[in-house]
């Protein structure tokens, strides 16, 4: 069975595994846990995504948990200002995960709490949600690993759990796989992209692409790294087509979105140490701009900028288990 197939099986069976484990504990005085698991399984069977809405900021409770949730939301909104040692670019979490992580066309975070742990082909391992958050810190924010045991990580996870309220374990909501896949298979033109950029993007991101206090840099030392999803042409085109310009999203054609993506990603940007070990089983998407197993780089940027502390930018991959024996991937 393929890794993708195992991931599908895992997601479909997690609610029932949880219920079975809780029932097994019932004889040890864990009847409350069993009842909770049965309730979770019942909710999974009756969950209707079309009528579900994520909680809003106004719904955050006024207690200790609510305080952690609010801190987590603040960290998403003001990431480099709050965590300058870990988010060293000009991007915030909400630069990509718009509407505080709830916008379906902008890599929504809703439901993430219910989907992890899960298998990630890029890392070739099953990872937890804290590791997935750190992939954003080290790649999309071109920063450093946020300690998983830190209060800040706990606050971020509290917020992700909050906006996933009532989503059944293992359930994939719309947008769960990240940015919406573009239906058109197009090739961006850098020269055309520059023209569109000058016409539609400079008001926020400036002619030099370095952005402003409110809008992030799109290339250079304070932008996303080559290891970020946004450094891939099709992924960037999807984000641009669905969400940009912010004042009139959806006004560009798919070809214009690909052209702008090609132009933006042709510029220098931070390196992503360890990127050559991505997709260890092969199968990297066609538009990945760096070499991996069996994959040649697709239109790499003009140059890569060295990271100040490369040893702090790599999220440790969980050990692979074969027949009960652990081995490093």
Give residue ranges: language-model regions.
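Secretory-pathway/luminal and periplasmic proteins that interact with or process carbohydrate-rich
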Residues: 82-85, 100-106, 163-168, 267-274, ...
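Extracytoplasmic electron-transfer domains, predominantly the class I c-type cytochrome c fold
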Residues: 36-37, 47, 66-71, 75, ...
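A structural motif
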Residues: 129-130, 160-173, 203-211, 229-236
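Sequence/structural segment immediately N-terminal to covalent heme-attachment motifs in c-type
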Residues: 64-100, 185-215, 233-236
